[in-house]
Swiss-Prot record:
Keyword flag Protein biosynthesis: yes
Entry protein name: Elongation factor 1-beta
HAMAP family found in the cross-reference section: EF1_beta
GO terms of molecular function: translation elongation factor activity
A Pfam family hit: EF1_GNE
Similarity remark: Belongs to the EF-1-beta/EF-1-delta family.
Protein function: Promotes the exchange of GDP for GTP in EF-1-alpha/GDP, thus allowing the regeneration of EF-1-alpha/GTP that could then be used to form the ternary complex EF-1-alpha/GTP/AAtRNA.
Gene name of the encoded protein: ef1b
Keywords tagged on the record: Elongation factor, Protein biosynthesis
């Protein structure tokens, strides 16, 4: 098994959700799963809405990114989570 870099797209439930607090929750959740969070970018979309893009490094294993996606989707203030890029390192 190898190491993969995964870029996730995390959408908050509303524009009122604090970007910094959400980014901190994402990083804390990812790192509690023994996954490395390399970077977090916040990109504006429209009408005050934004998306958070954490870049994570994890071991390639059965189930892929599902466990981390589910953990992030269960956070308060998160509407949806999806993988937008996955590459083998």
């Amino acid at each position: 098994m190898g190491i993969v870099m995964v870029k996730l797209k995390v959408m908050p439930v509303s524009p009122e959700v604090n970007k910094d607090e959400l980014s901190a929750k994402i990083k804390e959740t990812v790192e509690s799963m023994d996954i490395i969070c390399r970077n977090i970018e916040v990109e504006p979309l429209a009408f005050g809405l934004y998306a958070v893009f954490p870049l994570i490094e994890m071991e390639e294993k059965e189930g892929g990114t599902e466990p981390v996606e589910e953990a992030l989707a269960n956070l308060d203030d998160v509407e949806s989570v999806e993988s937008v890029e996955v590459s083998l390192v």
